């Protein structure tokens, strides 16, 4: 039961996350719930140790350690302390004109400070920097998903079929010339087909990317059309992948030169939702978890490289009509620059942008910020190791009135981070789409500014001086894990272990803590958690206690020995529909729907029919779940046997004909 400290009132709609090794069968080893109107919640999980996270609007985040046993339920009355008013950053909503459809897909600023936005209904609107008045600059575009403004009278928009230059030639504030800048890619009209971007470097070159189409109809086609690339798995089986590069250059990142030349740069991308160019003119792209993409990712894109999803290789001159094997893909694949673990680090990351505000946004100069389809903005701190980028990801702002669908961002001349928000109809937003901005109040946040690799561990640098007790090793916990690279839709964590801290110390600068770990291994994601309530020497609490460092490489001089840390196997428990509910929501509900009646568009069946799939025995259904069928991917290598049994138990209990919902 959740109650507010002080008045004892129940806390409703709090987000709760239970995480631990006993939930290895669940994505990211965690279950999620919301508290009811009376503040009550319940988790049913196997015996073992767990971390319980409680996140509620207006209250301080809370993490508890819970030990579950077989014969004794754990009952807790939990008091939540009211959160202090955010002292460092606040979220504000930008007023939009009533006649605008607020499905805002991109934002940018012109050199004169005008705010420029597109919506997915094909409009471009501009808010003047001087008077703050909105005007509709252009309309009739096809799902504009990116915008840049080279001048106060010219706007470039990436719509699905082309990049369009919009020019106001007579000074009346409305575009009267629409010019095609580039259209050198294929399209099919598939409902799941997107053109992502738009980013511009200092030389005026433009950058973007194309997502895969989904299985289904291709009502019309521009350019060549090709079937999915067949990649046999190591066991010789031919897998199914509903996301395919059927039109030319789907799954690619591209550049358009200033003269309009279209240049495909690199492939291996599934849904490159976020495209950004750094202050050094380097291209970074985020990708969304799915087949061949184990979790959300950030890539540093280099021409000619391959990033994981093989279907776009069919458009590469060296791979046209050439057989591709799984072993070839493993050797070619460039690992992600940064892994963004699903859950605490969002679900579908958006456009990366860099703090170049000259101190107007706080202490994070030069660092990267990424929005997400959830109400989260992440921060990324990169470093180069052996000439290759890798680094740490942190939660930056979560909640605080932030809306969902914030997948395109831009820093304004006022130093605020502006966020375009739309979810394109995938889910209810309760009227929350539009534009918001994150504003620095001028108060310095207490945060982990840098998380950097060392030869024997890591160094954490805080934004403010910290007391001597900050150097104690029992303030911190470190875990490491990996993901599978496979065709299945996402991946669970694997090889997950706690990494003991051998020693720690606070440097004389009072801001940097050195953590020496028992051992260092490359090719792992290291999870850092501050488990003590740290505060600065001024008494201000730490804002974000979690970070994830992607250690593709280690520093020269690091001693790497065979590991002595072994992940423990999890025992198979009896099938539990309560555990299966969470698995269904995370892995199945998008296609099979909350009511279990499926979708004709996607091709999923109706579980509630007396003659539907649930009329078949468990053995048949488990075989289908494991191996996949029609549009459904094989989950046998994504979810352990425990999860398969649990989700089937949930589906039978909830959607069986005897319990069919109206």
Question: Each PLM stretch: what is its role?
Answer:
Residues 9-10, 21-44:
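Short, acidic Ser/Thr/Gly-rich low-complexity loop/linker segments typical of extracellular
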Residues 51-66, 81:
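A short, solvent-exposed loop/turn motif at the edges and junctions
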Residues 83-445, 449-457:
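Beta-propeller domains with acidic blade repeats across secreted/periplasmic ectodomains
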Residues 409, 435, 580-594, 647, ...:
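The canonical Cys-X-X-Cys-His
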Residues 463-503, 529-536, 545-549:
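Short, surface-exposed alpha-helix to beta-strand junction/turn motifs within ectodomains of secreted
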Residues 578-581, 593-624:
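Gly/Gly-Pro-rich "capping" loops immediately C-terminal to redox-active cysteine motifs
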Residues 600-606, 624-662:
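Axial heme c-ligation environment in periplasmic c-type cytochrome domains
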């Amino acid at each position: 039961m959740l109650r507010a400290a002080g008045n004892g009132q129940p806390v409703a709609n709090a987000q709760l996350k239970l995480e631990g090794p006993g939930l290895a069968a669940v994505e990211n080893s965690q279950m999620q719930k919301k508290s009811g109107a009376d503040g009550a919640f319940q988790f049913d999980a196997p015996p073992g140790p767990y971390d319980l996270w409680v996140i509620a609007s207006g209250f301080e985040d809370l993490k508890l350690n819970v030990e579950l046993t077989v014969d004794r339920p754990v009952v807790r009355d939990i008091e939540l302390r009211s959160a202090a008013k955010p002292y460092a950053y606040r979220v504000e909503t930008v007023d939009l004109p009533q006649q605008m459809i607020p499905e805002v897909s991109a934002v940018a600023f012109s050199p004169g400070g005008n705010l420029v936005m597109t919506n997915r209904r094909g409009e471009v609107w501009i808010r003047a920097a001087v008077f703050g008045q909105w005007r509709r600059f252009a309309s009739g575009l096809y799902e504009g998903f990116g915008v840049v403004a080279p001048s106060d009278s010219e706007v470039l928009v990436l719509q699905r079929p082309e990049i369009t230059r919009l020019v106001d030639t007579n000074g009346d504030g409305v575009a009267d010339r629409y010019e095609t800048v580039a259209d050198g890619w294929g399209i099919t009209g598939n409902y799941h087909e997107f053109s992502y971007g738009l980013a511009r470097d200092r030389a005026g070159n433009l950058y973007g990317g194309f997502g895969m189409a989904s299985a289904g109809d291709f009502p019309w086609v521009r350019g060549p059309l090709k079937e999915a690339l067949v990649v046999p798995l190591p066991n010789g089986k031919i897998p199914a992948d509903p996301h395919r590069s059927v039109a030319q250059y789907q799954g690619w990142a591209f550049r358009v030169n200033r003269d309009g030349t279209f240049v495909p740069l690199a492939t291996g991308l599934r849904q490159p939702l976020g495209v950004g160019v750094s202050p050094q003119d380097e291209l970074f792209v985020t990708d969304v978890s799915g087949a061949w993409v184990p979790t959300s990712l950030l890539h540093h894109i280099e021409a000619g490289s391959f990033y994981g999803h093989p279907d776009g290789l069919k458009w590469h001159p060296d791979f046209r009509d050439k057989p591709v094997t799984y072993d070839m893909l493993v050797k070619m694949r460039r690992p992600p620059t940064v892994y963004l673990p699903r859950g605490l680090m969002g679900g579908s990351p958006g456009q990366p942008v860099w703090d170049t505000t000259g101190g107007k946004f706080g202490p994070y100069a030069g660092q990267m910020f990424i929005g997400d389809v959830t109400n989260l903005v992440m921060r990324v701190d990169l470093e180069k190791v052996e000439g290759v980028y890798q680094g740490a990801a942190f939660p930056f702002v979560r909640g605080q009135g932030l809306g969902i669908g914030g997948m395109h961002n831009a820093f304004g001349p006022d130093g605020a981070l502006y966020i375009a928000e739309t979810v394109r109809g995938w889910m209810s937003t309760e009227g929350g789409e539009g534009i918001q901005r994150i504003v620095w109040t001028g108060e310095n946040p207490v945060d982990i500014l840098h998380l950097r690799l060392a030869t024997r561990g890591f160094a954490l640098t805080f934004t403010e001086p910290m007391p001597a007790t900050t150097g104690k090793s029992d303030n911190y916990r470190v875990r490491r894990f990996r993901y599978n690279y496979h065709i299945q839709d996402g991946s669970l964590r694997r090889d997950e272990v706690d990494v003991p801290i051998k020693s720690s110390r606070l440097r004389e600068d009072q801001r940097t803590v050195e953590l020496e770990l028992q051992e260092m291994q490359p090719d792992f994601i290291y999870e850092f958690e501050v488990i003590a309530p740290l505060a600065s020497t001024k008494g201000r609490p730490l804002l974000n206690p979690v970070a994830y460092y992607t250690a593709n490489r280690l520093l020269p001089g690091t001693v790497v020995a065979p590991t002595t840390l072994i992940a423990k196997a999890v025992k198979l428990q009896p099938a539990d529909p309560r555990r299966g509910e969470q698995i269904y929501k995370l892995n199945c509900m998008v296609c099979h729907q909350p009511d279990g009646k499926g979708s004709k568009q996607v091709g999923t069946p109706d579980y509630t029919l007396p003659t539907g799939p649930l009329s078949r025995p468990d053995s048949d259904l488990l075989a289908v779940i494991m191996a996949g069928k029609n549009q459904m991917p094989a989950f046998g290598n994504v979810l352990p046997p425990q999860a398969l049994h649990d989700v089937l138990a949930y589906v039978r209990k909830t959607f069986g004909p005897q319990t069919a919902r109206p």
